[in-house]
UniProtKB/Swiss-Prot annotation:
GO terms for cellular component: cytosol. This is Ribose-5-phosphate isomerase A. The lineage of its organism: Bacteria, Pseudomonadati, Pseudomonadota, Gammaproteobacteria, Lysobacterales. It comes from Xylella fastidiosa (strain M12). Gene3D superfamilies: 3.30.70.260, 3.40.50.1360. Homodimer.
Length: 215
């Protein structure tokens, strides 16, 4: 599976151009992309990172990490996903960086998602849906989720996001209308971010098959 991730990541380098400032996500597939960025002869101006983990990795390769507030709109954002449906709608947040990932995706002209073939699904929801929550609202949000959906929220104990919040993973969902569910869950007081990327889905999905396939 690591080879599939590497193929997807290296294919994404084809979309990187000299002098770009690019958004960079978080996760095992993105780690391959950062390594490929470090090897490519293309020279970018810098990167906006979605996590402390990716920031450290980018700096190891000598890539300058910039603040989104200082860069404006980005031409390109590259990130992975936990699930991807045929319409390029995603579940993300397994690495607990969903809020910053969603912000950077919204700030980018093109969002390229890189995945291994196992991440493709017909309907989102088999992978538990991560939701970032203000700590004091954890129980309230969990009750609201159970009242509004058939899902079972589970606190991801011991995990604190880079923003100082907690994660609820919602199990046993069958998400037939991701845009609607994203909107509904975002309305619960205490919810910071829902790990559904449906309203702002990927523009392009690179699947690390042999050879890589573009969705």
């Amino acid at each position: 599976m690591s080879e599939a991730k590497r193929r997807a990541a290296e294919k994404a380098i084809e979309y990187v151009e000299n002098d770009m400032i690019i958004g960079v996500g978080t996760g095992s597939t993105v780690a391959y992309f950062i390594d490929a960025l470090g090897r490519t002869p293309k020279r970018i101006k810098g990167a906006v990172s979605s996590s402390e983990q990716s920031t450290a990795h980018l700096k190891q390769h000598g890539i300058e990490v910039l603040e989104l507030n200082h860069t404006g709109t980005l031409p390109l954002y590259v990130d992975g996903a936990d699930e991807c449906d045929p319409y390029k709608r995603l579940i993300k947040g397994g690495g607990a960086s969903l809020t910053r990932e969603k912000i950077i995706a919204e700030a980018s002209k093109q969002f390229i998602c890189i995945i291994d073939p196992n991440k493709q699904v017909a309907t989102l929801g088999k992978f538990p849906l991560p939701i970032e929550v203000i700590p004091m609202a954890r129980s309230l949000v969990a009750r609201q989720i159970m009242a509004r959906t058939d899902g079972q929220p589970v606190w991801r104990e011991g995990v604190i996001t880079d923003n100082g919040n907690v994660i609820l993973d919602v199990h046993h969902l069958c998400i037939t209308d991701p845009v609607k569910l994203e909107q509904e869950l975002n309305q619960i007081p205490g919810v910071v971010c829902v790990g559904l990327f449906a309203r702002r889905c990927a523009d392009l999905v690179i699947i690390g098959s042999e050879p890589p396939h573009i969705l």
